[in-house]
Amino acid sequence: QAISYQGIGLHSGEPVNMVFKPAPENTGIVFIRTDIEGYPSVRAHIDNVTNTMRATTLEHGEAKVFTVEHVMAAFSAMNIDNCYIEMDSPEPAVGDGSSAIFVGLIEEAGIQEQTAPRHVYKITRSHAIYDGDRFVVILPYDGYRITFTSVNSHPLLGTQNCDFEVSPESFKEHISAARTIGFMKELEQLQAMGLAKGGTLDNALVYDDEKCLSVPRFDDELVRHKALDVVGDLFLLGRIEGHVIAMKSSHELNSRLARSIMEEI
């Protein structure tokens, strides 16, 4: 059944009404801008990614949506292949800054099994994207696994490691509730760039130079959220089987990896 949710965008700070509706087989995940005449839509696919600075942006014709990674991570982990998402603003609601709200909405709406065979891209050789000391690699693997290492100079963060098999159970327990991170010293700069206008101490893990201003949900919440972003960004390629190993990866590197895999499909 359809289900709705209202909130504000993390970066835009704009209010948004979202309606999640069942979609036929082989539709994919489709965002529909109901605030634009003609209700233009954009399919959640790597070919439609146009920007990866601080968030992942999709664009097709007049339809543009950004910061889609938290929604996409929930759809990926909860095994949702087809859904229409109607939005009257360009950015999904931030919720609590994680994917937990979207996991809850999926469970509340219910999941309908469809009869078309699910297509899965099985990785048969390694793909690697490097950028200085940052990298993301995918290797052949029987299943879907994410191993992420985050390195941050903040004294309370340092090096964090995360390793998990992507399944509805593991995602809900270990990953979905991890929130995006922010630093007070960057806030003015980000807002001058039109970003982080909807960020608060409740929907982000916020640090000043010495302490965490939010209440952490995990000791390693930062790296868990980074792994969440990988799940969301790579679902723009589709379902995959492989082992992703990442060090300080970003939306840009995640998208470049998806494009590298796409070239062989």
Locate predicted features.
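C-terminal regulatory domains involved in ligand/effector binding and gene-expression control
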Residues: 1-81, 86-265
